[in-house]
């Protein structure tokens, strides 16, 4: 059971790191050198934290709770066009607003608003993919508080980086990032390729 929990934890950490790379990796490509360094540093901090804490937390689960977690995660995955996708529903108005901003980035205010929407959409996923499952797993008080702290720290690192980029990117760079991000939102679900 420990070997299974370790393997599950490592695989979940790998999936989580892929998600972070897909969300933030493109920012590094379109940014100025200093912004690129900051984005890469943020990604490294987040992925290192995930790689450290996710396998550890999974080792604390018995087989029944581990099976329940994997069952729920399986419902959030799909296989389309030869690719495995992780998906979660988002409110239609968020996707619509982001699409509108992607066609109308006329000012720094518009860019900042668009990046705030991206943070809101990502936070929907953090809740559905991380916070809600953590609650269902019913960790003991100390582990629960530790994980809540890790989740809070990593999300704030990512969100602050996105909000800062929303203030630093020019309209062309912001447009490129929005188009990159919108490719993950085909309808009312955000999909991330694994």
Question: What are these regions, as identified by a protein language model?
Answer:
Residues 1-194:
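Protein-protein interaction and targeting regions used for scaffolding, dimerization, and localization
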